[in-house]
């Protein structure tokens, strides 16, 4: 996939924070673990609704997915073999591995998008994709009229666009910077809104700078959107997740690399799957229900967007509470996940665990010992799961599928940890996520900068543009709460 698609580039090896675990030390997946499907069905089984105790909104969940798609994409490569998940509809191809790894060295999964928070999910990661998205008029991105309102929607993709999802005349796939943009209506609403935000700034800059050409307007508008995404991430979103663990901006560091770590992409930043609720909610401007859709029916389904526009979907995300961040996943993801090709019946939990083996993640205990150093594996009681969590019901679930604590997968153990007070995360996942976002910031020479050429008035407006303000100026959604990541009716 990475070799044939012109819209995937920047192919780099992901970093490793801990030692890789392969049976042969190179690439053969570890064979001593628990049954992946059994773990997914026992540990991650969720019985009913479990609203987030901190009141996080569905928009918090969606922005996390939107952000993830800016940072990392690891394509599959059938030439690398398959992962045979007993109980799943069919096997899954292994991930593409980085070419720069020499023969005999431990493999590393690739990342084919830029690691910076640069809006690549909106603009693309290659010149080909960027050009395909541009109108080349007034610095703006291509859009089409929304048939339900006077607003703008993303352009339709064609068969040469390499977008995930089935492309047909009856149910078009929308074109965006990231190939996964059409995965669900909530995600699609943010993809659309930030294109509108770009065009808002392109228009405003054109009024302020009459002598600027299309290229200047495009570059300036994009730089503003990049800045806004960075500020939302660090000032509004991350504090809810990990508190102040990321710390203050210390400026550019030439000795740091920002490339995404395997522990981040394959374990810690997959926490959001436990936050996902079982429905896509839509609300009218007066707060009345416009009809929800079961999550399992929403995969690559654009009808909610086409029928109601993105406004109703965004209102639903502002109002609805996410699920608890724990070791439970709604059935829609744990039993009825659907692939872009339309194959249903997958378990996202099982796939995540399989990717952990594919990417050579070590166990929770070993990674914790290496990265935090607060435990000594040699002194642990193998049957004492309280070293992971104080929740006795979770301990019992873990003990029913894992032979001992040393067998617990990194993703599972990280989700099971007791959260640090005032955050959503336990110590190990907090460490991994804080490490990533610290490096993402300090390794980016232009992070958080605005070009003085924008003008004082524009800069002042940009610097006060919270997520709530961005929603209000690009949609018909009124009375948006100041903190959009806490649900409000």
Kindly give the residue locations of the regions a language model identified.
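Flexible, acidic glycine-rich loops studded with aromatic residues
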Residues: 371
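Inter-helical turn/loop segments and adjacent helix faces that build the functional surface
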Residues: 201-217, 350, 354, 375
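Alpha-helical scaffold segments that form or flank carboxylate-/histidine-based iron centers
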Residues: 217-223
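Short linear, low-complexity motifs centered on an aromatic residue
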Residues: 377-401
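Short, flexible coil/linker elements and helix-boundary hinge sites characteristic
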Residues: 209-210, 380, 407
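N-terminal accessory/cap region of cofactor-dependent oxidoreductases and related radical enzymes
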Residues: 1-200, 204, 223, 227-350, ...
